């Protein structure tokens, strides 16, 4: 169960993430995108989910990742991601509730290129009862 004092906390990701053209090309091919001069908007969910797992499974946070399913996603894009970018990620646990025994957690992820905010994304994560 999520530790109640985790709500409202922001956690920094461990490392910067370097974006390669081959990663963009592979992701674009899977979703049928042909223009790979910039990363498709949903490309960054891979970064966010990796960071969420690292953050939310910390002992002081207490979420059981093995029972987690992804419920919803939205993005706010400020700048395009492209090959050669080095991005840092932070995640904020914005809300938490229990419904029918399931834990529902809303997490905002902010990706930065240096000091510039590139993308904010919000994920609703459900930890099954």
Where are these regions (language model features)?
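HotDog/MaoC-like acyl-thioester-processing domains
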Residues: 2-3, 77-129
């Amino acid at each position: 169960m999520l530790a109640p004092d985790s709500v409202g906390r922001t956690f920094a990701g461990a490392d910067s993430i370097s974006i390669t053209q081959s990663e963009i090309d592979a992701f674009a091919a899977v979703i049928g995108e042909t223009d790979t001069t910039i990363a498709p908007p949903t490309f960054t969910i891979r970064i966010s989910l990796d960071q969420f797992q690292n953050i939310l499974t910390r002992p002081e946070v207490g979420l059981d990742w093995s029972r987690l399913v992804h419920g919803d996603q939205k993005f706010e894009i400020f700048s395009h991601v492209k090959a050669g970018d080095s991005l840092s990620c932070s995640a904020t646990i914005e809300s938490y509730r229990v419904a029918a025994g399931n834990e529902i957690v809303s997490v905002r992820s902010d990706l930065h290129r240096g000091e510039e905010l590139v993308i904010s994304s919000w994920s609703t994560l459900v930890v099954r009862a």
